[in-house]
Structure formats: structure tokens, C-alpha cells
């Protein structure tokens, strides 16, 4: 699903089959949507702003939000009367969904299997999650020592929790109630439990909504933009596919090579 435009277009067409070809106001958010917004001239809301607006509008007593995405992780601290304070890791795969993907490959299992394996773990081992390279080495050592995949899977999630807490809190207290956000925390129970252990909290202190992976999108509803774009589902789906086709054609033609011949290169 790396083809963002076509993936969104397909989802819109599926939605059309359920709710009809309704009119909708379009707002884009998320790192993957920034380029799409610029190409199509659509309103864009920064993800942290969308998330913050969702929390404020929900009337939930949220003090902290922990978000683990595919390529970054962030913690947002909420304090009444103050601007939300964000800490983000976007420079390394450590503590992100990409890190989970890497570790699943090392273990030779599907990402979906890691959670079930971790639920049957008996021991937690130290794994360096700050860097995927070091973590891979640690996991390979555990495999060589015949440590069970169950224990390794649980240790991977424990390492992610440690990485996010230690690198992003930066001395600030992570106070409950904590809202969990992003695909990994929404779908992986063992990862949520790892945060409970590391923060010494109960399950009720961490709030995971049914659609926690869509919190930024829902936050766009409460975010004001300078421009408005209203269209039908089918029209927008077609626009996405057309924009994606033109971009593909451009990328295939590409820029001119620096060296026109092997002789110039040598």
C-alpha cells in the first residue's frame, strides 16, 4: 500500500458502495499526505495539530498522548491553559512500526504473528531498540541461544516501549490518562501491555479507542483551514488516480543523467 493516492482512491470507491456518492469536504493530514496535498492543491493540517484538536474537542481528560506510526513516534503532553508540548522521533526507525516490521523479518514470522507469540512469553530480554541494526544483532544472538520466539517477540515490544518513553519524555512526567494513537498501539495488545509495565500503570490508565489509528483523520474535522475543498467521493477518487498516473509518468521519464556516456563517467 505504498501507492498512497491509489490506495485512498480505492477506499473512497468502497465507501461509495456503502454510503453512496455523497459530497464531502476534503482535508489531508499525515506525513504521507503532505506531497499529495501539494500536488492536488488540497487543504493540509499538520498531524500534531489534528491530534491536539481531537483531544481538545473530545472532552476526554487526557494528559498524555503516545503515538507510534510507521515511520515516527511522538508523545504529546497536554496541560490545561498551556499549548500542547510535543516530542517526536522521526530520524530513526527505532521505536516505530518500521522497527516492528524489521524484527518480524529477522524472526521469520509475519507481523501479525508477533502479538500472539508475545502473549505466551515467559521472560523478557534486553534488546537495543534505538537502532534497528543493533537490535537485529541482539535478536540474532537470542535466536542463536535458542531463546523462544515467544520471549523474543515480547522483548521486542518491551524494547519499543523503553525507547519511546526514555527518548521522548526527556524528563517530563507521562501522566495518565494516556491516549494511545497509531496502528501498532491500536492492533498490538502486547505493545500496549509493554507500556503498562514500563510506566507502572493499569490498563484503565491507557485509553485505546476502537479507531485510535484514525485519530489524526478525525482531528481534521475540528481543524480550521484557510481554504475549503468539497467534492463527491467518485470525483475525488478519479482525481487521485489521475494525479497518481501523471506523477508515475513523470517519474518514469525522470531527470537527465549526470553522465551521458560511460566515457564521461570514466
Language model regions located:
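Short beta-strand-loop/turn "lid" adjacent to the catalytic site in phosphate-handling enzymes
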Residues: 1, 16-49, 58, 77, ...
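Short glycine-rich, Thr/Ser-proximal phosphate-binding strand/loop in the N-terminal lobe
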Residues: 1-8, 13, 84-92
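Glycine-rich phosphate-binding loops at beta-strand->alpha-helix junctions
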Residues: 32, 169-198, 209-213
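Conserved phosphate-binding/catalytic loops in two-lobed NTP-binding clefts
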Residues: 44-48, 195-218
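Glycine-rich phosphate-binding loop of actin/hexokinase-like ATP-binding domains
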Residues: 46-107
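Acidic, glycine/GT-rich loop-and beta-edge segments that sit at the periphery of enzyme/chaperone cores
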Residues: 74, 223-266
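Glycine-rich phosphate-binding loop plus the immediately following alpha-helix
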Residues: 82-123, 213, 219-228
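Adenine-nucleotide phosphate-binding core of ATP-dependent small-molecule kinases
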Residues: 135-170
